[in-house]
Amino acid sequence: MNVAVAILILTLSALQAPPPNMSAIPAGDFWMGRVHFFLIDEVGWLERDRRDDLPAHRVYIDAFNMDKYETTNEEFARFAAATDASTPWYWVKGAVPKGEERFPVHDVTWFQADAYCKWAGKRLPTEAEWERAARGGLDRQKFSWGDGGLGLSGSDTDTQVSAEATNTKRAHVGSPTGPTTVGSYPPNGFGLHDMTGNVWEWTNDWYDRDYYSVTPDRNPPGPAKGVYKVIRGGGWSDDDDRNLMNHYRNFSDPSRGAPTIGFRCAKN
């Protein structure tokens, strides 16, 4: 092989490689939203169903990079030290609680999450990017690992598999009392950990119940304005299968943090 060609190939490979601790999410389209129907005895929440995940629609997303892990306390501490940003209330005198360095930071507002990502040279993912990444290449599936539910049948087998897959109350029969070390559970098909459970994750999008009726089919940016920001993925306190599904949409006040909400960053 010509030396110049070999150098060019190596250079292009290096340019295409994702940054450290990030996974490359390939460009492609996928079904976004709810693409299946529930039996009433499967979940029992149809009466209070917002139906904001309908209609299901095909969406194309350009290639991007996504953090493999939720942003940790120790990472946020470096940001706070460099920028004099405020720290979460549960830190002890402004310091990360001992032993929780690799836990996901939580009780941070959307604005704090946005500021961290920008400081790190990244950004918050759009809601569509988040769902594309969470699915891990599995289209039309309820969960990041496929269609297997979290103990829907009540069998010991289902519960055991779930406990090995995610940190959430539903999986561990009520045992979790908070988030756990990032990366404690197997990654999805794109190499991302804790896209289900541990903490909910802020996205860049404003929440609009009816956005799926008007969303563009390529790289939807989210609504131009709103009151709440979209959060995704479910958290350690969830005992409802619905909250843990790839398509499930939730929202929160961007000016308020919560013990169940954290974030991770994306990058073009």
Language model region names:
Residues 1-85, 110-111, 137-139, 148, ...:
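Short, compositionally biased
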Residues 24-25, 31, 36-41, 45-48, ...:
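Functional-site microenvironments in short loops/helix caps that host divalent-cation chemistry
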